[in-house]
């Protein structure tokens, strides 16, 4: 079993689509979850469909540990102070192979790339660019 730190780099979004009845630019942000550890990006105020976040988030990892669901879950939202935040879509990144390799050799990386944002698992709502790095500790 290996312990380590996983760093998730949320870089940007492209073509994010949210329903805004007033046609205002969207204010996207992402909620990020890994095995119950939750993080939240900054709101990209008035960024519209192509936000730049360039934020890094750290998660403590125990691999293989308990439970077998090794996915990073992103819930992409549009901040709306007046009538509540609007759901845009989700991204699910499987990191099991990344963690297995990282435990074996000391580190591992998923270079940044675009991932499709899907609403209700089927409706394309744009993309987010994400990279992931894992470093074994001890």
Curated annotation (Swiss-Prot):
Free-text tissue specificity from the UniProt record: Sieve elements of leaves, stems, roots and flowers.
SMART domains from the UniProt entry: C2
Assigned keywords, A-Z: Calcium, Metal-binding, RNA-binding, Transport
GO molecular function: metal ion binding; RNA binding
Ranges of residues in domain C2: 1-108
Binding sites annotated in the UniProt record for Ca(2+) 1: 20, 27, 78, 80
Family matches, as Pfam families: C2
Gene3D superfamilies: C2 domain
UniProt keyword Metal-binding, yes or no: yes
Cofactors: Ca(2+)
Chain sites annotated for binding Ca(2+) 2: 20, 78, 80, 86
Signal peptide: none
Role of this protein: Binds to both sense and antisense RNA. Interacts with mesophyll plasmodesmata to mediate its own cell-to-cell transport and potentiate RNA trafficking.
Name of this protein: 16 kDa phloem protein 2
Record organism: Cucurbita maxima (Pumpkin)
Organism lineage string: Eukaryota, Viridiplantae, Streptophyta, Embryophyta, Tracheophyta
